[in-house]
Amino acid sequence: MSELKTISIRGAREHNLKGIDLDLPRNKLIVMTGLSGSGKSSLAFDTIYAEGQRRYVESLSAYARQFLEMMQKPDVDQIDGLSPAISIEQKTTSRNPRSTVGTVTEIYDYLRLLFARVGVPYSPATGLPIESQTVSQMVDRVLEFGEGTRLYMLAPLVRGRKGEYRKELAELMKKGFQRVKVDGQFYEIADVPALDKKYKHDIDVVVDRVVVRPDIGTRLADSIETCLTLADGLAIAEFADRPLPPEETSAGGSANKSLNETHERVLFSEKFACPVSGFTIPEIEPRLFSFNNPFGACTTCDGLGSQQKIDEALIVPEPNRTLRDGAIAPWAKSTSPYYNQTLEALGTVFGFKLGSRWSELSEEAQEAILHGTKDKITFHYQDGARSYNTTKTFEGIVPNLERRWKETDSAWAREEIERYMSAAPCPACAGYRLKPEALAVKIHALHIGEVSEMSIRAARDWFEVLPEHLSTKQNEIAVRILKEIRERLRFLNDVGLEYLSLSRNSGTLSGGESQRIRLASQIGSGLTGVLYVLDEPSIGLHQRDNARLLDTLRHLRDIGNTVIVVEHDEDAILTADYVVDIGPAAGIHGGEVIAEGTPSDIMSNPKSLTGKYLSGELSVAVPGERRKPKKKKEVTVVGARANNLKNVTASIPLGVFTAVTGVSGGGKSTFLIETLYKAAARRVMGARENPAEHDRIDGFEHIDKVIDIDQSPIGRTPRSNPATYTGAFTPIRDWFAGLPEAKARGYQPGRFSFNVKGGRCEACQGDGVIKIEMHFLPDVYVTCDVCHGKRYNRETLDVHFKGKSIADVLDMTVEEGVEFFAAVPAVRDKLVTLNQVGLGYIKIGQQANTLSGGEAQRVKLAKELSKRSTGRTLYILDEPTTGLHFHDVAKLLEVLHELVNQGNSVVVIEHNLEVIKTADWIIDFGPEGGDGGGEVIAQGTPEEVVKEPRSYTGQFLKELLERRPVKKVVAAE
C-alpha cells in the first residue's frame, strides 16, 4: 500500500467549524490563518492534533494509557493520513521553580554527565586540584621519586582540630605504633607532651620509614593500605631529606604543608580530599550536580537557589512618610497603641520623634528599629487603665517577623508576613543551587553553576573551543557529550533565544519563548514522520530573528515531518508550502475554509481577507499626523540597571501612543514592566511589588492610574466569564430581578447567580456539566440531566425577558446581546465595548478558561474602555497583537488610539511593524539581546527612528514604509 500523500479531513464540526472538508499535503509546511476566533485553533489543535494524539494513545496498553492525558474524540466524521502528533503551544513551560531552560532542553543533563566524567575537583582552600588514586597508582608515584629517596609514610589522623587526644594516642600504642608527628615535631608516642585542648592540633602516625628501591613495591603497598585504613582514605609520603625552601616555611607558604611542617610532602587520597582543609568530595557522579537530588542540592535552600527573606524595602516602602503616618508598613494598620509607644521609647534613646520622616532618622536609629538593640531600653506602655514599665532589649522588626514566620502554624499569619518578604540569593550557594562539593568540580576553570549562568550565545562559543583545553583522554570521553550539547545550543540559537541563560527559571519565560524552547528540544530529538502543530511561534520575536525561526520550521519539514502552524505573521504565511485561510469572520460567523493553496493562490482569491492584506490591497494605515509629545508632560526613568539594562535613562511622553521596541532580550520588559510599571503601581496604586533596580522615576504627578493589560486568564474556573469580568452580569441580574414575574415571586438579584444556592441547579452546582472520572480514558463531562446544561433550576428559568431566560442570555453572542439589550443602557454599554475590541463573536457567558490569551487581553481592554475616563491613566500592554489577524490589529489600534484621544497614555511592547508604524513615539532597545543589549538605541517618531543605522527596528520599519503603498485605509486615524 503506497503512503498517503494527504491528510484528509471530512466533516469537521468542532466548536464553530461548519462541517469542513479539507485535504492537506503531508510532509509540507502548512500555515493556517484567519481572523481571531475564526476557528483556526479548533481545526489545527482541537481536531487534527487531538485525533492524531488520541489514536496514538489508544494504541497503547490500558496500563500505559492511565499515565497519559487522553484527548476527547473531536467532532469530525473522518480523518485519514494522520501521523502521531506533537503540539507545541504558547503555554509557559512550567511554574515549577526547579525547572530551568537547561533542564527543559536536557542540556543540563548532558552538562551533569560532562562534569561527572571529565570535571576536575579543586580545593576551595588552596585552589589546587584534588585527585583520587588507587593503591597501585600511589605505589607507582612513590617509586618515581627516585632510588635512595628517604621517606616517612604517615597517616594524617587529626587535622586542625582542638583536643587532648590522650585516648587516641594510647590506642595507637596498643596497636603497635611507636612514633607520631604532632604539630610538626616527631615524638615517641610515650613522650608526646600534654596537648592544650584549647588549641588546634595536627597528628600524623608514622606507619613506616622507607628508602626507595625498585624491590619495595609490596612493602610500600602494605604501608599505604595501613595509612588509608587509619586516616580514612588518606596517606602522606614525607621526604625525610628534603626540607622546604625557607620562603615556603614562612606564613602563607606551600599549600602542601600543614602548621609547623618543614619538609616536602605528597598527599594521596583514595577519595577526593584536600590536603590542607581536609575538604572531601564523595564519588563524582551526575547526581552530585543535580539540584533536584538531595545528593547534590544545596542544603540551605534545598536546591532552589534563593530564600524568602524579610525585605527592608517592603517594610519601609515610602521613606518620606513619618513614623506616625505609617512609614513602617507592618505596623501601619494596627490600632493598638503598643507600636507607637515602642517607637517613642526608641526615639528617646536614638533621638527621633513620631513626627520624624523615616528618611530623616540616623542610620543607627534605622538599624535599631529594623534589627534590634544590643543594650536594654526602658519601655513605658499604657494599655487603657493599666500602665507599666519594662526594661529589655528590642528584638527588631526584621528578626520579629522572621521568628513569627518560622513559628506560626497559621496559613493566614504566614501569608500576612510574606507580604514583606522577597526572594534573595541563597547565602550558602550564592544562587547556584548546589552543594560546595559540586561547585568544587571544574572544567577549564569554571564550575557547572558558572557555565549555566552563561547566555546561550556565550555558552555556544565556550563549548566550541573547550576541546582545545581538554587532555586527549578527556576529549575521548567527552566527544559524544559535547556533540549533543553543541547541537542543542545551536538549535536554541537558531530559534532566536541566544540571550537566555541555561539557569533561567522556566516560569519567567514568555509564552513565545517557552514555545520556541520546546521547538528547539523537538529538533534536538530528530524525530521524523511526525505531525507537528504549532501556535504562533513568532510571538515575542523581532523581525530580525524571524528568518532563523522559519529556517527551523523548514528543517523540521525537510527531515520528513508535516508541520502545521497557526500564524498571522506575513513572512511565515509567504514562506509556507500551503496556506489555509479560515473565515470569513469570527465565532459563529466563521468556521469555513475561505481559501486554500499556495501563498499566491491566497493573494489572488477575492474572498480572502488575508490575501488582500498580503497583496497590499488593504493595509493598516499610518496616521495622517502624529501627536506631538509635550515637553514637560512625561515620565522619566533614571538609572534603570536590572538584568541587562546598562544604567538606562529614558522618558515616556504622556498623552501619546508609545511603542517600546527592540530585539528579543534587548531589555524592553525589564524597563517597562519590571521597572516602570512596578514602581508606578507602587507609588500611584499602593501595590506592594518591588520594582527592579533604578535610581528614581520623575513625573508620576501627571498620572492617577497605571494599568498593565496582560494576556493572563481573566479567571481560571468555568464560573468566570466575560459578563462577570466586565461587570455586565450585575446589571443583567438586576434587570431580571426587576421583571414583574421575578417581583411577584420575590426574587432578588442573587437568585440569578449560578455561584450561590437559591437559583442555581444544585445537581451540578451551577456548572451545567457533571464530571465523571474514567480511569483509563479521559474524564468525561456530561451535560447535567437535571438542568440540561442551563445551570439554573426550573423556577429561575421561568422568568423571561423578550421570551428569553437568563440562561438564554448567557448563551447569546456579544453581538446578539447588544441588539437584545438595546433599551437597557447599563448592560448595552458594557457589551458594546466588548464588540468594539472585536469580541462580538464570543458568548456572553463563555467560560473564561476557553478564551485565548489575546481574547482575555481584549476582554480586559473592554473593561477599561467601559470605565469613565479621567484622561490621566497610563496603560501598559505587552504584545497586544498576539493571536491577532491584520484586520484585528486594525480594530485594536482604533481602540488604543481612542484611549489616547481621551487624554490617556498608551505604551505597548511590540514587534508587529503594523502597530509600530502607527505609534507617535518609539523607544528602541538593543542593539542585541542579553549582554549585548540593554541600551536605548533610538527614540523619536517612526520617521526619526528609521534614520538610526544601529536600530534593527528602524531598518525593517523603513522597508515597510517604502514597500507598501496604501491603496485603501482600514485603521485608526
UniProtKB/Swiss-Prot annotation:
Top-level taxon of origin: Bacteria
The record's listing under Pfam families reads: ABC_tran (PF00005), UvrA_DNA-bind (PF17755), UvrA_inter (PF17760)
**Which InterPro entries does the annotation name?**
ABC_transporter-like_ATP-bd, ABC_transporter-like_CS, ATP_grasp_subdomain_1, P-loop_NTPase, UvrA, UvrA_DNA-bd, UvrA_inter
Compartment(s): Cytoplasm
> Which positions bind ATP?
34-41, 662-669
Question: Can you give the residue ranges of the ABC transporter domain?
Answer: 331-609, 629-958
Indicate the transmembrane segments per the record: none
Q: Which segments does the record annotate as C4-type zinc fingers?
A: 761-787
Q: Which GO terms describe its molecular function?
A: ATP binding; ATP hydrolysis activity; DNA binding; excinuclease ABC activity; zinc ion binding
Which Gene Ontology biological process is one annotated for this entry? nucleotide-excision repair
Example GO CC term: the record gives: excinuclease repair complex
Taking the first listed entry, what is the main subcellular location of this protein, grouped into a coarse class?
cytoplasm
Which keywords describe this protein according to UniProt? ATP-binding, Cytoplasm, DNA damage, DNA excision, DNA repair, DNA-binding, Excision nuclease, Metal-binding, Nucleotide-binding, Repeat, SOS response, Zinc, Zinc-finger
**Alphabetical list of NCBIfam families matching this protein:** PRK00349.1, uvra
> Per the similarity annotation, which family is this?
Belongs to the ABC transporter superfamily. UvrA family.
Cite the record's note on assembly.
Answer: Forms a heterotetramer with UvrB during the search for lesions.
Primary role = The UvrABC repair system catalyzes the recognition and processing of DNA lesions. UvrA is an ATPase and a DNA-binding protein. A damage recognition complex composed of 2 UvrA and 2 UvrB subunits scans DNA for abnormalities. When the presence of a lesion has been verified by UvrB, the UvrA molecules dissociate.
Query: What name does this protein carry?
Result: UvrABC system protein A
